[in-house]
Amino acid sequence: QMLSIKAGRKIYERLETLCGARITPQSVSALSDEAIRSTGTSNAKVSYIRTITDAVLSGSLCFDELRELSDEPVIKKLTALRGIGTWTAKMYLIFVLDRQDILPFEDGAFLQSYRWLYNTTDTTPASVKKKCAKWKPYSSIAARYLYRILDLGLTKEDFHLFK
C-alpha cells in the first residue's frame, strides 16, 4: 500500500507522540496494537512493525551491521522479514545507507519521472534496466534527480531528452 508523503508524515508524527518523541524498538514494543493502529496504521502494518521490532530487540536484525554488507545481502536480510519487500529494501539502501548504484525500477514515483524523461510508456523492468544501464555505477544518484524532478512538478511539463 502506497502512502502519500503527507499521510506518512502524519502517521510518523502520531507514532512519535505515542513513543515520547523518540521512536525506538523499545518504545514501540511497549505500545499496544491498538495504540499503533490509532496512528492510522493498518492491522497488517502493525504486524509488520511488530516483526521488525522483535527482530531488532532479539538481535537478529542489527541496522549497524547492514552498513558493512554489500547491496544484495542487505536486500536479502531485509526482505527475509515479513512486511519488507524489495522496494523498502532499495529505499533503505538509497536514502539511509546512501548506496550509489541502486535502480528503483519498482517505484511508481521513479517510473513517473522516468516516463517523462524518456517520453515512453514502456516501463517494463527489462526496458528500464537496459535504458538505465548507462547510469552505472551511479544509478541511485540519477534516481534522486528523478525524484527531485517529480518534487518540483517538472513532470507536468512537456519534455523529451532527445529533442
Where is each model-derived feature located?
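Generic structural signal for hydrophobic core residues of well-folded globular domains
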Residues: 2-3, 15, 52-56, 96, ...
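C-terminal accessory module of base-excision DNA glycosylases/AP lyases that mediates lesion recognition
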Residues: 86-163
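Alpha-helical ds-nucleic-acid-binding substructure associated with the helix-hairpin-helix region
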Residues: 3-82, 134
